[in-house]
C-alpha cells in the first residue's frame, strides 16, 4: 500500500470547511453535499469513474409547541423540547398526576396508569410500548448533566421512530429541572405538545470506480455527512466522510480489481434513511455486493478504535490479521451496529463499521477543534489497507452471508 497517498492534514483541511450544522433536509445538509460534489469533480476523475447524486424524500415532524407546567403543589413552567414523532396532545394539553418512575422498572410502572411519568432514559420504541402498556398518560425524558451551565441547559431534541400508533406524547426536560421536579414534589402537571409532519429532501452522493478485472463484484465504502441539529458533527460524522474521501482519492490512482463505490449518505441521524434508500433503490444489484465498509465516529486523538462486524465470524479473524500486519491497535466486535452498515447487513450484505471513541457526540461541542491529523491519517490508512486487500484478492476471502442470529436482530431493529 502506498501510504504517502493518505494525508490526515489534507483530510482535516477539508473537514474544516464543514464547521456548520448539517441537519438532514435543511440548507446546511444541501450545502455540505454541494461541497463534497465540487471536491470530487476537482480531485477525482478518470476513465471508469462516475459520480451521481440520488435525492430521496423522508418525513419529519416539526414541533410547533411544547410546554410542561406544574399545577400542584406549586405552579411553574419548565423549559422543554417536544419529542418528535409521538403525535400531539389535545389543543389545551393534558393534565394528570405526575410520577417519577426512574428506569421504568416493573414495580415503578405498576403505579403509572393515568399519570405523566418522568423517566431516566431515552424513550425509544420498546420503552414507549412499555409505557403505553402500563397505562401512562404521557412521558417526560431528561437530558444533560448536573454540571451543565449556560446554553447546555437546553434540553436535547429527541425523536420516536418506528411507531405507527402514538397514543401518548412526551417532552424532554434538562437534568437540573428533573431534579427540581422530584425534590419539590411535583404531583400534577399539564403537558402540551403540538407537531406536524413535513416532507424533506436529502440526497446520497455516490462515486463509482469500475473494477479492472472483477468488475461484477462490488465493495462499498460509506459514511454519513449529515449532523444532528445540536452541533456541527465533526466527530459524528464529518470525520468519517473525509476518511471516505481519502480512500476515494487513493483508489482513483491505485485502481481496484473489484468495483468500488464510495458513498456519502444523507439523513443517517434521522433513522439511517440514506442507506436504507440506497439498498432499496439498488436491490437487484445488491447480489453483486460483497462487503460494506462503513465509518461512523472518527478523528479524535484520545480514544480506542473499534471495528464492528455484522457477518460471518471469520471476517473478524481476517480483519484482525490485517490490523496486526499494519501494527494498528483495534478491537473487533461481532454484532449489529447502530449505523448505516446495518442497512446492508439487513439485506444480506456483510458489513462493518469503523468507529473511534470520542467526546461530545450529538452536542454543540462536537467541532473540528477536537479532530486531529494523527487520528484521521491512522484510521484512513487502516481502512485503506483493509479495502485494498479485499479489492485485490484473487478469490474473495469470506462468504457473502449474514448469520441467522444477526438477521433476526436486524429484522427487530428495522421493524
Language-model features: where?
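Metal-dependent peptidase/peptidase-like ectodomains
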Residues: 229, 265-359, 364
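Catalytic-core environment of secreted peptidases
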Residues: 6-27, 36-47, 116-121, 138, ...
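Extracellular/luminal Protease-associated
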Residues: 78-163, 167-169, 330
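N-terminal capping segment at the start of a domain
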Residues: 1-28, 54, 150-151, 159, ...
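His/Asp/Glu-rich mid-to-C-terminal helical/loop segments that flank catalytic regions of hydrolases
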Residues: 249, 360-415
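Soluble metallo-hydrolase cores and metallopeptidase-like ectodomains found primarily
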Residues: 80-100, 104-106, 155-234, 246-249, ...
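Noncatalytic luminal/extracellular "stalk/propeptide" segments of secretory-pathway proteins
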Residues: 1-8, 13-113
Amino acid at each position: 500500500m502506498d501510504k504517502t497517498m493518505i494525508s490526515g492534514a489534507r483530510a482535516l483541511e477539508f473537514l474544516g470547511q464543514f464547521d456548520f450544522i448539517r441537519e438532514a433536509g435543511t440548507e446546511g445538509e444541501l450545502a455540505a453535499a454541494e461541497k463534497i460534489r465540487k471536491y470530487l469533480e476537482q480531485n477525482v476523475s478518470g476513465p471508469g469513474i462516475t459520480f451521481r447524486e440520488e435525492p430521496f424524500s423522508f418525513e419529519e415532524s416539526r414541533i410547533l409547541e411544547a410546554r410542561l407546567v406544574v399545577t400542584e403543589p406549586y405552579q411553574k413552567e419548565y423549559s422543554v423540547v417536544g419529542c418528535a414523532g409521538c403525535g400531539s396532545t389535545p389543543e389545551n394539553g393534558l393534565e394528570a398526576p405526575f410520577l417519577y418512575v426512574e428506569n421504568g422498572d416493573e414495580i415503578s410502572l405498576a403505579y403509572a396508569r393515568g399519570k405523566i411519568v418522568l423517566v431516566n432514559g431515552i424513550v425509544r420504541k420498546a420503552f414507549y410500548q412499555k409505557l403505553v402498556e402500563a397505562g401512562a398518560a404521557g412521558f417526560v425524558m431528561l437530558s444533560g448533566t448536573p454540571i451543565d451551565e449556560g446554553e447546555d441547559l437546553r434540553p436535547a431534541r429527541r425523536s420516536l421512530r418506528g411507531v405507527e400508533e402514538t397514543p401518548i406524547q412526551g417532552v424532554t426536560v434538562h437534568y437540573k429541572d428533573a431534579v427540581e421536579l422530584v425534590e419539590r414534589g411535583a404531583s400534577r402537571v399539564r403537558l402540551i405538545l403540538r407537531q406536524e409532519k413535513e416532507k424533506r429532501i436529502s440526497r446520497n452522493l455516490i462515486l463509482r470506480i469500475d473494477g479492472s478485472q472483477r468488475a461484477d463484484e462490488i465493495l462499498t465504502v460509506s459514511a454519513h455527512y449529515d449532523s444532528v441539529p445540536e452541533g456541527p458533527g465533526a466527530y459524528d460524522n464529518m470525520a468519517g466522510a473525509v476518511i471516505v474521501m481519502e480512500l476515494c482519492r487513493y483508489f482513483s490512482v491505485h485502481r481496484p480489481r473489484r468495483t468500488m463505490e464510495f458513498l456519502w449518505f444523507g439523513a443517517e441521524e434521522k433513522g439511517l434513511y440514506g442507506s436504507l434508500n440506497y439498498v432499496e433503490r439498488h436491490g437487484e444489484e445488491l447480489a453483486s455486493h460483497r462487503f460494506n465498509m462503513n465509518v461512523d465516529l472518527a478523528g479524535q486523538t484520545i480514544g480506542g478504535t473499534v471495528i464492528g462486524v455484522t457477518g460471518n465470524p471469520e471476517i473478524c479473524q481476517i480483519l484482525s490479521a490485517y490490523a496486526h500486519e499494519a501494527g494498528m491497535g483495534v478491537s473487533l466486535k461481532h454484532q449489529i451496529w447502530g449505523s448505516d452498515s446495518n442497512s446492508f447487513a439487513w439485506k444480506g450484505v456483510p458489513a462493518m463499521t469503523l468507529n473511534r471513541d470520542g467526546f461530545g457526540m450529538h452536542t454543540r461541542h462536537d467541532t473540528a477543534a477536537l479532530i486531529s491529523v494523527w487520528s484521521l491519517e491512522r484510521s484512513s490508512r487502516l481502512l485503506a489497507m483493509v479495502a485494498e486487500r479485499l479489492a485485490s484478492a484473487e478469490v474473495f476471502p469470506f462468504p457473502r452471508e449474514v448469520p441467522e442470529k444477526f438477521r433476526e436482530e436486524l429484522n427487530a431493529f428495522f421493524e
